[in-house]
Each structure stands twice: as C-alpha cells, then as structure tokens.
Amino acid sequence: MAAAAAGGAPGPAPGPAGPPPPAAPTSAARAPPQALRRRGDSRRRQAALFFLNNISLDGRPPSLGPGGEKPPPPPAEAREPPAPPPPEPPTGLPARTPAPQGLLSPTQVPTGLGLDGQRQRKRVTSQRCSLEFLEDAVGCAPAQRTKHTSGSPRHKGLKKTHFIKNMRQYDTRNSRIVLICAKRSLCAAFSVLPYGEGLRISDLRVDSQKQRHPSGGVSVSSEMVFELEGVELGADGKVVSYAKFLYPTNALVTHKSDSHGLLPTPRPSVPRTLPGSRHKPAPTKSAPASTELGSDVGDTLEYNPNLLDDPQWPCGKHKRVLIFASYMTTVIEYVKPSDLKKDMNETFREKFPHVKLTLSKIRSLKREMRSLSEECSLEPVTVAMAYVYFEKLVLQGKLSKQNRKLCAGACVLLAAKISSDLRKSGVTQLIDKLEERFRFNRRDLIGFEFTVLVALELALYLPENQVLPHYRRLTQQF
C-alpha cells in the first residue's frame, strides 16, 4: 500500500527549473525608480546649464574654452529621448546611482569646486566676448554694422587693439574708441569725426541760413567777409604801403619835402579838408588803377551828406509840382507804400548804377545803426560820423549784399573809438551789441575793421560840413 502510494504518486519529471517565486517588496526594491527620476532631472538640468553657459555676449558661439580647447558638442542624451531604465539590481544589493558619463558641461568640476568653477567659466566667457567685440569695433570688421555707424571713414587695415590710459598720447581722428571697465566689459563705443578741418570756424555759407532780420538778407559769406572792392590788403606775405593815404600836418615835414624839390603825389580819392579850414581844394579826377568801375564813379563824386537823406527820393514820378508867382508847391497823390518803395529804388538805381544796394536797404541799415547807438548810449555826433563813413563806402560802390552788415558794424566801431572816450569795457560791450544786432562773428568784425579803415583812406577825422547835417537830423529824431 505504501509502495503503491509511492509508485502511484511519482515526483515531478526532471526538467529545467522554473523561475523563483517573486519576493516580497522591500525598501531596497523601491529605490531604483526614485534614482531614475533624480537622474532624469539631473540630465535636463545639465543640458540647460550647457545651453546657457555657451551663449556668447556678441551672438556668436565661443571658439575656445577656458583651457584653450574647443568645447565638446552637446550630449546626445540631451537631444534624444531618455533611454529605457536598466535592469533592476539583484535583491539584497544597495541601489546606486552612477554619475552619467559625458554629460558634464565644461563649467562643471568635482563636488566642492562646482560654484567656483561656474563663476570662473562665466568670467572668462564674458572677458573673451568683450575682447572679441572690442577687436571687431576697432577694426571695423563686421559688415553688418556698417549701416549703424555714423559715417566715419573706415580703415580696413587697422585691426590692432590698443589699451590706452591717456588719450592724448594717440591720434584719435577718424577712429573708433571703445570704453571698457576694469573687468574689460563693454561700457560705450563712439567715433571721433573731424569738424571744420581746413576751414575757419567763422566761415559761413551764403546759403546756410536764411533768417529774416530787421535788415533782411542772408548771412555773411566767407568769400566776401574780409575784402572790399578796390581795397588791397597785404595777404600771403605781400607788402602793401598805405603811405599815399597820409598827408603831412607838420610844418617841418612840409619844408623838408619842398627843399628837395619833391612834389607830393596827388591823392586818388575824395578830397578832404582839415576841421576849421576855409580852403576847399578842387576835386581830383585821378583814380587808382586797381579799382573797378563802381569805385571810379564813386571816387570822382564829392560826398554830399544830404544826398541819401533827400526827402524828394520817395516822391519819384508820383509828385506834381505847381509853380506860382511867389511860391512853388508839390502835390503827391495817394499811392501804395510798396509801389512808392519800388519806384524810389528804381530811380536810385538809374542815377547810381554802380551802387549794389537799394536805397531802402541803405536807410534800413542806418536805422539799425541809430537804434544800436541809443542802446549803447552813444552821442549823436558819433552816430553822425558813422553815417558819413557808411555813406562814403556806399557811394563808392564798395558794399555788397554779403558785407553790408559787417561794414555798418565796423563804421559804428570806428566812430565810437575816434569820437568818444570808450574804455576797454565799453568797447567790449559795444562789440557784443554789434554781434547780437547784426548777427556776425566778432572775429569777422575785428578783421573787417582794418579793411574799412583802408577803404576810407585812413580819413577818420571829418570836416564839420560833412557831419553837421547828419547831426541836426539826429538831434531832431533823438
């Protein structure tokens, strides 16, 4: 029975052993999923740090790493989906999280030095990018920045970077300068452009600004500022003598010239007499060969102080003269002021074709001279002398549209110096007022003063018969 039971219940047939029964879950078996999550987060963090640390400041990928080697390419794990989890470790063994190989960025170093390594990596990258931008800015290399530059000349051969502390040691013309801080990070970049190279600062253009002033017109031209027609100045080392404009006033000089039998050369100008003298010499007809037609016509005419202020000028063809037995009268019908002004200028141009200014413009300049003299508290006799200087130059045809204001200002300045007791402060104030009123540079005025003096033939002391008519009219108007 026992044998039958033993034979009837044979054991299992020999064969391959089956898998062991699953073990009960323990704390060691739950460790691998957490380690996988931490490892996935570490991969993503490392990929993000690698991407951020390789961003260049100038938009270009860095060419060299901190140690001079090229940076490795981005890890393949950062571009591919995460790999399947590895097989579970055998039961009873502690779960380990091995550090991924090939995923460390150049900025990462072993534990304990990671923070310092990242700071050093960022500092080196910033310095390298700043130096690369500095070299590109100094050498003007990138062609993409040409449309943003200020138009300064570009030197393609200049690609060398200079670190300077004193800008006076280098010539910064036509160059670009980049300012960096102590850590060599960019602060500012600018160019040095030449202004007015080879030109005077006081030079102005005729077509520069057309502002409407009380006397109208455009600004002073640099070509006509320092010259008058018929006036020759000693330029470019040329010696010019103005002795012909001087006449002897000492008796000894007169006798000495007579003893040698030398006759004084006649003056080719408008004759003038000394103040208080009753002798009036005849006008001379000779004229300098260097003067033009307008100057010849003006020099042959004797100056009349009542010519330009004649009240008959505005009448023109609009007046009607009635002659009676005992008196004569003039009747002027009503006419528009613009037509009256036009007719006056045409009549004046027909009588004085060599004068380049209109009569209305001449009178406007004289009104400005009088207004300026009132502001500076000048005496009426000073204004009268300035009128004589100005009208002489006008009738000689030496004034033009470009130099009329400079001539008027120079006449006021000469009259103030010769007839009033102005000190240095008073002369400075007068020059400031002239510069403000006539809108020219004081350097041009001072340079033009001698030109006007030569054009007047150094005759600043005037006879009474030339000054008194203007003085009477001014005292009635003041």
UniProtKB/Swiss-Prot annotation:
Segments of skewed composition (Basic residues): 36-46
Annotated region Disordered: the residues are: 1-121, 257-296
Annotated GO biological processes are: cell division; regulation of cell cycle
Q: Which Pfam family is one of those matched by this entry?
A: Cyclin_N
List residues modified as Phosphoserine: S130, S208
This molecule's function is given as: Unknown. Probably involved in G1-S cell cycle transition.
Q: Which family does it belong to?
A: Belongs to the cyclin family.
What name goes with this protein? Answer: CDK5 and ABL1 enzyme substrate 2
Instruction: Record the organism.
Output: Homo sapiens
Q: What is the lineage of its organism?
A: Eukaryota, Metazoa, Chordata, Craniata, Vertebrata
